[in-house]
Amino acid sequence: MRPFFLLCFALPGLLHAQQACSRGACYPPVGDLLVGRTRFLRASSTCGLTKPETYCTQYGEWQMKCCKCDSRQPHNYYSHRVENVASSSGPMRWWQSQNDVNPVSLQLDLDRRFQLQEVMMEFQGPMPAGMLIERSSDFGKTWRVYQYLAADCTSTFPRVRQGRPQSWQDVRCQSLPQRPNARLNGGKVQLNLMDLVSGIPATQSQKIQEVGEITNLRVNFTRLAPVPQRGYHPPSAYYAVSQLRLQGSCFCHGHADRCAPKPGASAGPSTAVQVHDVCVCQHNTAGPNCERCAPFYNNRPWRPAEGQDAHECQRCDCNGHSETCHFDPAVFAASQGAYGGVCDNCRDHTEGKNCERCQLHYFRNRRPGASIQETCISCECDPDGAVPGAPCDPVTGQCVCKEHVQGERCDLCKPGFTGLTYANPQGCHRCDCNILGSRRDMPCDEESGRCLCLPNVVGPKCDQCAPYHWKLASGQGCEPCACDPHNSLSPQCNQFTGQCPCREGFGGLMCSAAAIRQCPDRTYGDVATGCRACDCDFRGTEGPGCDKASGRCLCRPGLTGPRCDQCQRGYCNRYPVCVACHPCFQTYDADLREQALRFGRLRNATASLWSGPGLEDRGLASRILDAKSKIEQIRAVLSSPAVTEQEVAQVASAILSLRRTLQGLQLDLPLEEETLSLPRDLESLDRSFNGLLTMYQRKREQFEKISSADPSGAFRMLSTAYEQSAQAAQQVSDSSRLLDQLRDSRREAERLVRQAGGGGGTGSPKLVALRLEMSSLPDLTPTFNKLCGNSRQMACTPISCPGELCPQDNGTACGSRCRGVLPRAGGAFLMAGQVAEQLRGFNAQLQRTRQMIRAAEESASQIQSSAQRLETQVSASRSQMEEDVRRTRLLIQQVRDFLTDPDTDAATIQEVSEAVLALWLPTDSATVLQKMNEIQAIAARLPNVDLVLSQTKQDIARARRLQAEAEEARSRAHAVEGQVEDVVGNLRQGTVALQEAQDTMQGTSRSLRLIQDRVAEVQQVLRPAEKLVTSMTKQLGDFWTRMEELRHQARQQGAEAVQAQQLAEGASEQALSAQEGFERIKQKYAELKDRLGQSSMLGEQGARIQSVKTEAEELFGETMEMMDRMKDMELELLRGSQAIMLRSADLTGLEKRVEQIRDHINGRVLYYATCK
């Protein structure tokens, strides 16, 4: 309840401080920096450190008094060590230097940075004639003077000006305050830093930053105060400071409103401080002095808070992919002060200053609802079609494809290409299909490379019309011959001209009309005189080929030339396929023709103009006059004195260049055409460069693979490459032989054709007879049926074989009911591809399974390592716990010995008592009762032997856990016992302290009677009386301090007695409850024992049950021991409470007697108590 009320009181202050920090700079409250830090204070000279020393001071007008300084012991009454200047040292304590030592310094060396606000010094003796205060903010490396102080600045510091400083480097001298008797009775010096720099134009925050930060402070006494001499013995010259206050706080750069203890700081009374060391930082700052931005708040540079501007550190923007960042000044300057944080250790495959882009070979995940861990996914480029080593687009994921490859993953060949392989630098190779007979959008299948023919076009390359069709050159497929069935010799027409073979007396393309006596197609002239062959390329002609009269070739649209073998202007591609160019070419060509016409007209007009007797064109004359005026203007500009020679030369050079350009202007169409071809040349060069780059990367990868592999693998690779090269060479040689054979066959066929055409009557009957024989034999229908797998009924001979041979569209697969060699071969090929794909999938699945097995092995190894590490930690923790118990018992014994030592004073007893009572015990008897209930619950679950046998393992584990918890409760009970023993020791020590107080009072009474008898002697002999009075004063001060401490201790012990009585009553009630619980446990245990006795032959299970029983008996014994100890503790508390009440009654009477003695002594020794 008490912490709740403290929180309620502190909460408004905390909220107010946070609001103050939210409005701008904020600073912690000030306190005395010296309290609790006297160990950091040192003096260059201290009296009585090695041996006692005597110093004399002026007393009254003509007298002097001399006192002793003995600083060998820190708490001696005559000790004047430097730690006495702290405000916590109490009255009648001061620091004093040795006599006649000059200069002397007091220096404070702190271990952290603090903010100093004010320095206050009170002097015990004469004020110094000259001194200076300086500070260091880098732990003593460099020093800067705050201010010079002197009784006479002109003589003490002649080179230092007086007044207020006007800049940070301006240091002035301030006169010391002059008061009556200041040289004899001391004085006070106060230095406020804000008042010191009040004349400097700067904000409050800037002043604190500039002069408030300290790590070291030094006060240098440079000149002793002049003391006038009285009689033959001069007074002693020394420096003495009774109190030094350093008001300040922890130094937080305006980013904190309170301070906290540093980690691991001791909380003892001797080290209690008013000002803690570490700042509780605000504004997203961190560090002991808030000197840097907190982690992940580095988006702007750190700056001290100033006035209303907190200069709050801003959080870095890493898009959720990092928790660490750093500040980069270059980035901050490039963003013009907008941001400067650079993220570190980007996760999820991201990179960049803000983890805003994907890493190389990763791209942005565009799937809706993707988690932040799936922001970037790996590129899915096909290694066969993508450029090796080239990353995909980080936004779209588009891979960089080879020249003849397309698709987002580079897994498809472009139209007209097939055979995607990794070894091909261009990815795919061009289909070997006839451009006239194949489809325009997709000439071939991209996987198999099979040509896709137009309607009625056949052949592996789509280069032949189907039987009874012609006109392959149309590009739309072949058309039926449509020969007249009565007038033609055969339904098959010429594939190129469509001319049907007509019967005698009939003519025309389809033999549909009677023959006209004129030269046949592709000839011209007169039939009577003889027909001559047309000199034309019939692939580019139409109709009869040429004019029957003149022989001029009749070109198809888009073709030109004497033989119709050239593409007409406006048509592109190569002959015989001439297609209309892009519409932009027509526009460009029209513009060129218009410009050519205009140029011709201009040339004709100019020639007629200069050939006449004079210039008749008035417009031309006006233009010439205009040119002359411009030339005059140019001359005027050139003659202007404001123009330099360099500018004139530049203008002249420009005019000369323009004149040359005008003179060289002419219509240069070839240059324009060359310019238009430059983009194509650049594209060709780019493709060549990409091919070379791909080849280089492939060779490099092969080299790296070979260099990283073993020599046997490299040898196998070389052998494979050699075999592939040999096979390729063999194929080339076979192709060469096949081409030679085809060439010979073609020549032989041409020779036979010529012979047949020019043989006259001898050859014709033989050819007719051969044709008649081949029209019936051999019959190829069974062969084609076996080959194609169909049931053809029509006869097929070498002369006539109508219809399609294989109606399955160029030999495609026909499914599971295939018959014939060709369909089954196609089906087998497809099945082989499917099996290969299944094998690749099976291989990938094997790889994934292998990875899963490896991951499982690694997980098992990690679990085993974790178990071993946990076992080691448990063993170490047990050893550490046993060592802590041993050290705790040793400490309790040491404290007990220290408190029972008769030489220990009451103040030390009080400090130890406070420290012991301040300890917080984490447990009480309620914990013991809880463990009893758990043991009882276990006993309740044990009566059924069959259930015990089935759950032996779980019960053993649960028993071991409860055993550990019981051991922990036992340790806590020992701690409670130690606390009670400490309380008893405190009571005994209180008794000893009371006895010492009675002895001291008796000694004081004897000293008082001695003083009353020797008053006359004291007036005659001064020095012995002074020594005696000094001794009595010291004893009186010690006695009064001890009595105050004993009074406080008595009150506290009374309250503790009441609390102990309440605790004893509660412990008694819990003990009774625990006793009842143990009675129930005894009953359950007896029943369990009976059942276990009945099942003595249970083998291994019985042994386990016996082990559980033994552990339960041990727990029961330990619990009974704890109950006995609790009873003993209750008795000790009762006896201690009674002893405290008796001692309190005795202290009441002694307090009155002490007050009477104090008043009497103060009245008698008032004259002698003058040594301050």
Swiss-Prot record:
Keywords, comma-separated and alphabetical: Amelogenesis imperfecta, Basement membrane, Cell adhesion, Coiled coil, Disease variant, Disulfide bond, Epidermolysis bullosa, Extracellular matrix, Glycoprotein, Laminin EGF-like domain, Repeat, Secreted, Signal
Biological processes annotated in GO: brown fat cell differentiation; cell adhesion; endodermal cell differentiation; epidermis development
Region feature Domain I, mapped onto this chain: 817-1170
Protein name: Laminin subunit beta-3
Any one GO MF annotation of this record: structural molecule activity
Domain Laminin N-terminal: 22-249
Source lineage: Eukaryota, Metazoa, Chordata, Craniata, Vertebrata
Parts of the chain that traverse the membrane: none
Native source species: Homo sapiens (Human)
Implicated disorder: Epidermolysis bullosa, junctional 1B, severe: A form of epidermolysis bullosa, a genodermatosis characterized by recurrent blistering, fragility of the skin and mucosal epithelia, and erosions caused by minor mechanical trauma. Junctional epidermolysis bullosa is characterized by blistering that occurs at the level of the lamina lucida in the skin basement membrane. JEB1B is an autosomal recessive, severe form characterized by bullous lesions appearing at birth, and extensive denudation of skin and mucous membranes that may be hemorrhagic. Epidermolysis bullosa, junctional 1A, intermediate: A form of epidermolysis bullosa, a genodermatosis characterized by recurrent blistering, fragility of the skin and mucosal epithelia, and erosions caused by minor mechanical trauma. Junctional epidermolysis bullosa is characterized by blistering that occurs at the level of the lamina lucida in the skin basement membrane. JEB1A is an autosomal recessive, non-lethal, adult form characterized by life-long blistering of the skin, associated with hair and tooth abnormalities.
Signal peptide feature range: 1-17
One Pfam family this sequence matches: Laminin_N
Coiled-coil features, chain-numbered ranges: 723-757, 831-884, 948-1133
PROSITE patterns the UniProt entry points to: EGF_1, EGF_2, EGF_LAM_1, EGF_LAM_2, LAMININ_NTER
Cross-referenced InterPro entries: EGF-like_dom (IPR000742), LAMB1-4_helical (IPR056558), Laminin/Netrin_ECM (IPR050440), Laminin_N (IPR008211), LE_dom (IPR002049), LMN_ATRN_NET-like_EGF (IPR056863)
Summary of subunit composition and partner proteins: Laminin is a complex glycoprotein, consisting of three different polypeptide chains (alpha, beta, gamma), which are bound to each other by disulfide bonds into a cross-shaped molecule comprising one long and three short arms with globules at each end. Beta-3 is a subunit of laminin-5 (laminin-332 or epiligrin/kalinin/nicein). Interacts with ECM1.
Region (Domain alpha): 786-816
GO cellular component entries: collagen-containing extracellular matrix; extracellular region; laminin-5 complex
Keyword DNA-binding included in the entry's annotation: no
Cystine crosslinks: C250-C259, C252-C279, C281-C290, C293-C313, C316-C325, C318-C343, C346-C355, C358-C376, C379-C392, C381-C399, C401-C410, C413-C428, C431-C444, C433-C451, C453-C462, C465-C478, C481-C493, C483-C500, C502-C511, C519-C531, C534-C546, C536-C553, C555-C564, C567-C578
Residues of the Laminin EGF-like domain: 250-315, 316-378, 379-430, 431-480, 481-533, 534-580
Function: Binding to cells via a high affinity receptor, laminin is thought to mediate the attachment, migration and organization of cells into tissues during embryonic development by interacting with other extracellular matrix components.
Location in or out of the cell: Secreted, Extracellular space, Extracellular matrix, Basement membrane
Tissue specificity statement from the Swiss-Prot or TrEMBL entry: Found in the basement membranes (major component).
Gene name in the database record: LAMB3
Top-level lineage group: Eukaryota
Domain notes: The alpha-helical domains I and II are thought to interact with other laminin chains to form a coiled coil structure.
